[in-house]
Amino acid sequence: MKNMLKLATPLLLALLAGCASWNVPPPLPGESRAAVEARLGRPTNVYQLPTGTELEYATGPYGQATYMARFGPDEKLISYEQVLDAPGFARIKVGVSTQQDVLHTLGRPAEKSYLPIPKLYVWSYRYKESGVWDSMMHVHFDQDGIVRMMLNGPDPAKEERRFFW
């Protein structure tokens, strides 16, 4: 029993630490990067852009939200938003946007795959369609890293299994 308690204690503490960050109020424009990182923790990725720094806070691979904190050259917060939604996906332009553009707009994908016949790389993002439906957006890139198509549909990980296989 003591060994079981020793094993369960770190797991319980990790779960409680994760719960503590769920209800953190969002940072406000004008806050410093240090203040944002102190409040939200270490970002899942940091992007250096010509306009300033961007911090990614992804909840994946099974989360349905990615938050981007964008800072100006003065390291003050310009915007903080959830990007896995219709307005976020609308920023991606088929035939124009690159993998880097998608990474800076939507953050890291939940899944990556390759379709050999059309020779397309696919980045998949889990999200809530209209805030209700468990969905996935699939962004397809050609060999040059240009977006060629975007398809959305139900998230297979959240779909009810109707058959035995």
Predicted regions and their residues:
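Bacterial N-terminal signal peptides that target proteins for export
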Residues: 1-9
